[in-house]
Amino acid sequence: MSMIRNITICCLLLLLNVAAQAQETTDSVTTDSVSTQTTKQKLMARLNQVQQLLDTKARAKVDSNYIEVPKKPWRVVLRYKESVYDVDYSNSVGSPAAGDGMDWEMRFEPPLSASLGVWAGYRGLGLSVAKSLGRKKGTSLSFSCTGAKYGANLRLRGFDIDEATLTGTIYEGGQVLHGTSDAHFRAPVSIASIYLNGYYVFNGRRYSQAAAYNQAVIQRRSAGSLLLGATWYMAALDYSDDMNTGMILLSRNIGRINVQQGNIGVGYGYNWVPFRGFVVNAMAMPAICFYNRMKVYKYDSNYEIAESEGQVDDYGQWNPDTHTWANGKTHKPIPIDDDDTSWYGTVDSWEVGSETTFSMLRFNVNLRIGIAYNWSNYFIGLQSQFNNFNFKKDQCKVNLYDAWARLSFGVRL
């Protein structure tokens, strides 16, 4: 409840700030100067009351010998970030255990993604917007709320990629063949994620998780604390475009994957302060996944993978209304190793349904390292974080690795 109350107060603070500035502009053009001045004074008085409340709450619950609350509450930060986001999706086609089929793994491993963004906030509340640099475009939004005893972060991210690594093991006629190749998607694959994290600090009077990550406060002496944390993670992988039909056929006709996970864990964080203004933080939190759901969307098309190469009969034209070829058949075979790609021009695919499965309890991990140095009204920081989320059901496995490193420079106002 304290977190919700602080968020509400911050929103009110920002709205009052905007209203006060708008009212000040109106003062220069209005003819009713007395009434306007009175309204402005009331707004500014209310704004000061809210600011004083937040400032008082920021100082009331900490030991000033260990944690310093800066006098200037506003912070504006310029951030440069390098991100890594890997998705490993593996499955089986046929019956590999019986010696006839294929195990395969598709790995989306985009190169390091660089982004530049701005973070702005008041005390422990802030909002950031970042835009990807270079060829791989994407946008990231995040909201953070931290206090002496708690913290919460919400991160939204989305980007497109058209490359993956495909590793396969083929079982046929008693032979086992291994192979790895680069897969180039003819249409971009869309990847989006939502990450919500919250934690409780048992030793909040002397230890601040925020000191090394958003510089809401300054850690004056070394201290550590047990942490109780929870995360909610959602990821969506979409390669259902008609031009990606070949990969959909290899994926058991799956064209979209949605994963949702809820995790809870207990960890430990420590702030080391070798000299004034400088802090090094390390945090590790193993977590148990108590909710693990994967929903896949199945697609059908007018093509199917042929079991062997050979002459393909004349199928004529495809009728999208009846979902049949001119010869009455519904699927035209294509050899899996056929180099002829002209058939892509006649692909027609459509969604036919979805399947939802739940995985057993899984173990994930959340690791963080942060360094910050504060001087005068300025600060500089270097932070990194690693998250792992995984799903397993029968022959289907999904592993997601989400990591980033960030360099930031900010000023207190």
Q: PLM ranges: what are they?
A:
Residues K57-P73, N203-G224, P274-V280:
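Short loop/turn motifs that connect adjacent beta-strands in outer-membrane beta-barrel proteins
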Residues G101-W104, G138, G179-A187, Y213-N214, ...:
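Extracellular loop and loop/strand-boundary signature of outer-membrane beta-barrel proteins
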Residues R107-P110, W119, L133-R135, P188-S190, ...:
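Short sequence motifs at beta-strands and strand-loop junctions characteristic
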Residues T39, P70-V76, A114, R123-L125, ...:
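Outer-envelope beta-barrel architecture signal
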Residues D88-S95, S140-S142, T165-I170, A210-Y213, ...:
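Outer-membrane beta-barrel translocator domains and adjoining extracellular loop/strand segments
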Residues L78, L116-Y122, L141-G147, L196-F202, ...:
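Residues on the lipid-exposed face of transmembrane beta-strands in outer-membrane beta-barrel proteins
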Residues Y89-S95, M102-E105, G117, G126, ...:
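Outer membrane beta-barrel transmembrane domains
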Residues K81-A98, R155-I194:
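Outer-membrane beta-barrel translocator/channel fold
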